[in-house]
């Protein structure tokens, strides 16, 4: 996003509008083209893996530290937050790696659009539907895998076959609704901010960047929370099925007197 914003500012000053690509495009013109967006996502994943490695070493060291104490408080808070949607702290702890990974990837992707690198900025990957659709598909597959693990293959298939047309359509639409919501919000933000900076290039950037940081974090929270809600719906169905497998409990005949 930053590249686009500053390019617009240059264009308004009479300079040629041109966007530089920070990385070379590999295998260009083929089905296996590796463009700047893909390389940017690889860099995000590499950065998150490095961060996870550093944090893991700090936690497993066993030595008391401010970082360790802060992480314990953060984990406790996240467990409580996710448990309010998933149903229990046990389940929240079990699926926190997935949820936290999604959150970190999305928020870093959103914030890349605010990196102030004139002429060689990085676009927010989440401002492209291909990225958000991939995230939506990952969530959809993860939810179905969780359903199979909790209900069993037979129970999952029975659940799918018993869905009504609207419920089945809802299951299919989930990844698209998630991806379009995130893509639309980030792309709309980039477009709006580009127009604002084009109109007021000297006074707009700082408050607009602050707004982008808040908005980027909010979108990451929304996407992760909706994922937790989808997982919670699967687990809720499993718990209801465990208590009343075929509905016999509600319809047991009264004992004869």
UniProtKB/Swiss-Prot annotation:
Entry GO MF terms: proton-transporting ATP synthase activity, rotational mechanism
What cellular-component terms does GO give this entry?
plasma membrane; proton-transporting ATP synthase complex
Query: What is the protein's name according to its record?
Result: ATP synthase subunit a
Q: What does this protein do?
A: Key component of the proton channel; it plays a direct role in the translocation of protons across the membrane.
Q: Which SUPFAM superfamilies match?
A: F1F0 ATP synthase subunit A (SSF81336)
Q: Where are the transmembrane segments?
A: 34-54, 103-123, 133-153, 195-215, 216-236
* Protein topology in the membrane: Multi-pass membrane protein
PROSITE patterns from the entry? ATPASE_A
Family, per entry? Belongs to the ATPase A chain family.
| Keyword flag Transcription regulation | no
**Where, per UniProt, does this protein localize?**
Cell membrane
Subunit and partners: F-type ATPases have 2 components, CF(1) - the catalytic core - and CF(0) - the membrane proton channel. CF(1) has five subunits: alpha(3), beta(3), gamma(1), delta(1), epsilon(1). CF(0) has three main subunits: a(1), b(2) and c(9-12). The alpha and beta chains form an alternating ring which encloses part of the gamma chain. CF(1) is attached to CF(0) by a central stalk formed by the gamma and epsilon chains, while a peripheral stalk is formed by the delta and b chains.
CDD domains associated with the record: ATP-synt_Fo_a_6
What broad class describes the main subcellular location of this protein? Answer: membrane
Query: Which biological process, per GO, is one annotated for this protein?
Result: proton motive force-driven plasma membrane ATP synthesis
* Entry keywords, A to Z: ATP synthesis, Cell membrane, CF(0), Hydrogen ion transport, Ion transport, Membrane, Transmembrane, Transmembrane helix, Transport
């Amino acid at each position: 996003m930053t590249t686009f914003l500053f390019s617009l500012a240059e264009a308004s000053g009479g300079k040629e509008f041109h966007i530089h690509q920070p990385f070379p495009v590999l295998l260009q013109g083929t089905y296996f083209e590796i463009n700047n967006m893909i390389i940017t996502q690889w860099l995000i994943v590499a950065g998150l893996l490095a961060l996870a490695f550093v944090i893991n070493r700090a936690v497993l060291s066993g030595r008391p530290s401010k970082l360790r104490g802060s992480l314990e408080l953060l984990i406790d808070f996240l467990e409580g937050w996710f448990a309010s949607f998933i149903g229990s702290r046990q389940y929240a702890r079990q699926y926190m790696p997935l949820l936290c990974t999604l959150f970190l990837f999305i928020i870093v992707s959103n914030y890349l659009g605010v990196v102030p690198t004139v002429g060689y900025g990085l676009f927010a990957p989440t401002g492209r539907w291909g990225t958000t659709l991939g995230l939506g598909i990952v969530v959809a597959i993860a939810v179905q895998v969780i359903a199979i693990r909790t209900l069993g293959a037979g129970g999952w298939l029975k659940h799918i076959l018993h869905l009504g047309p609207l419920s089945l359509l809802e299951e299919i639409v989930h990844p698209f609704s998630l991806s379009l919501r995130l893509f639309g919000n980030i792309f709309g933000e980039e477009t709006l901010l580009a127009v604002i900076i084009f109109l007021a290039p000297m006074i707009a950037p700082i408050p607009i960047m602050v707004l982008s940081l808040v908005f980027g974090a909010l979108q990451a929270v929304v996407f992760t929370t909706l994922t937790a809600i989808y997982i919670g719906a699967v687990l809720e169905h499993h718990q209801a099925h465990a208590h009343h497998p075929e509905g016999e409990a509600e319809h047991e005949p009264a004992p004869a007197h």
